[in-house]
Amino acid sequence: MDAISKTERRKQSLSVVLSTYGPGLLVTAAVAMAAQFLSEHYGAPAMLMALLLGIAFHFLAEEGRCVAGIELSAKLVLRIGVALLGMRISVDLLIGLGGGTILLLVSAIVATILFGLVAARLLGRGWRLALLTSGAVAICGASAAMAIAAVLPRNEFSERNLIFTVLSVTVLSTLAMIGYPIVAEYLGLDGQATGIFFGGTIHDVAQVVGAGFSVSPEAGETATLVKLIRVTMLAPVVLIFSLVLRSVPQEGASIGKRAPLVPGFVLAFLVLAGFNSAGLVPVLASEVGMAISRWALLAGIVAVGMKTSLRRVLEVGGDAVALVVAETLFIAVFILAGMYYLGHS
């Protein structure tokens, strides 16, 4: 009798969970699939489609049965997607690229973030937006923005700033995918140098691949490798941000429990990267993990879009646009200067 009552309680609990979160999760999944469909059939970036479609369904996040599930997608599902990116990372990537190029990439990331903080101050913008935009530009675009946003102290502008950052870096990545091959040809870069330029400067992975292989197989393969090295820096940078922000009293942050010393999704990213480096992750498992990561990130950005009013995004101002454009130009010039110093041409 007791066993039957336990079974009934489990069924009731499951029913409550499904009824609470199910509608919102299903809605974000459906919109994510629509975004992927549009991306595959019309060539638009999937992240951009997910974001715009999410904003169009903003009314679903205001009230009703979908609210809880949308909130879960915007937080837990999104962080699962970031954590699973670790399955793409291995020590072999670092070895295959060479010390000089790796040092250039690390220097570019640090310099871009510092430049973003200084530029934001000159433009009268806050440090939260500076860390968000410069981190996204320096590392891996929308994925980095979502990971960094998860450890920043929250205020009334948090979701607006995240949406703006994802939107701006995705648009700039698409423009770079079109324009940077012209720049590379004008500068007379060879296949490897072109790949380093694309992989070290374009924000999102998909656009890096598109730009690289539009030039040559060598440029595409090198660009992808270089970009994955930048993705490797995501966890260390987010961890450093988290540690620094914990040690500094924050003004204007919403009151709540303190963030953990090491965010769980960052720890999972590092563990998965370690397993992959040790050869403990089968190829099939890695492919499945990356597919789940891609869909989780799409669903997460759909949910973030749903939670944000387009009117509030438009309030961000021209100086914020100038900031992210300046950061994009800065990392491009920095990488090109470093390449010429190292003899890549």
Swiss-Prot record:
State the source organism's domain of life. Answer: Bacteria
This chain belongs to the protein called UPF0324 membrane protein RB0971
For this protein, the record's Pfam families field holds: Cons_hypoth698
Output the InterPro entries linked to this UniProt entry: UPF0324_pro
Where's it mainly located? Answer: membrane
Q: How does it sit in the membrane?
A: Multi-pass membrane protein
Its annotated compartments are: Cell membrane
Q: Which PANTHER family match?
A: INNER MEMBRANE PROTEIN YEIH-RELATED, UPF0324 INNER MEMBRANE PROTEIN YEIH
Q: Which family does it belong to?
A: Belongs to the UPF0324 family.
**Keywords on this record?**
Cell membrane, Membrane, Plasmid, Transmembrane, Transmembrane helix
User: What stretches pass through the bilayer?
Assistant: 13-32, 42-61, 93-115, 130-152, 161-183, 193-215, 228-247, 262-284, 291-310, 320-342
Cellular-component GO terms for this entry: plasma membrane
The lineage, from the top, is: Bacteria, Pseudomonadati, Pseudomonadota, Alphaproteobacteria, Hyphomicrobiales
Q: Tell me what organism the protein belongs to.
A: Rhizobium meliloti (strain 1021) (Ensifer meliloti)
